[in-house]
Amino acid sequence: IYHDPEFEALCLDWAKWLMECIPRTREGGFQHVTSANGDRQGVRLNESEMWIDTLFMTVLFLNRMGQKYGKQEWIDESIKQVLMHIKYLYDTHTGLFFHGWSFNRMDNFGGVFWCRGNSWFTLGILDYLDMFKGTLNQGVKTFILDTYKAQVRALRDLQGEDGLWHTVLDDSTSYEETSGSAAITAGILKGIRMGILDDSYLPCAKKAIRAILKNIDTDGTVLKVSGGTGMGYDRDHYKNILIAPM
């Protein structure tokens, strides 16, 4: 965490807001609060909705703050959120994650396996576990790692011929997407480095790296990156997201 009094105060305020004020779903899940459609200054609460985005954007932060400031209640809340997001977003049939879950609809919206959303778990969950420095309950850690390994097995089977993954992972007619592919690759490489995955995953990672490098322009612009992606009710929503090089 950046050691600047101003930013430290902001981070503490945000952590307290997450614990005390963030809108919650049934069972206490964090709602994924976003900017309003067409209004970056507005707020959309996404009532009773859980998104995979939240794990990477919010839960990692809460755990890191809890670890830094010795706030066990913040750490415990982060564990609850990880387990709850796995409970409602992980698909045991495929090993992949749905983008979201609605307690109002009692379904996973369009039931779509979005590449970038899955990549946030692949990479983010190892960063999350790293923060515990071996202190996480072994049963919880094993459950999370088993989920990670099952997801990576599924992702390896879905890698495109050129090395990238499609924005709808199990739909080869959807475009290949670089940002999600990069995070998946980083998550696989970190898994190998940590000894969680064996070296049989190296060819998959190396193939992806070659494809990713081909999609970085000479000025550093990353090509084939899908723009901001809200919740979709069908595959076409994701397939029609504009490509916005970064």
Language model features with spans:
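Long, well-ordered core segments of solenoidal/helical folds
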Residues: L10-T34, Q72-F98, I144-G163, C204-T221
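Active-site lining segments of carbohydrate-active enzymes
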Residues: L45-N46, L60-Q72, I79-K80, M84-K87, ...
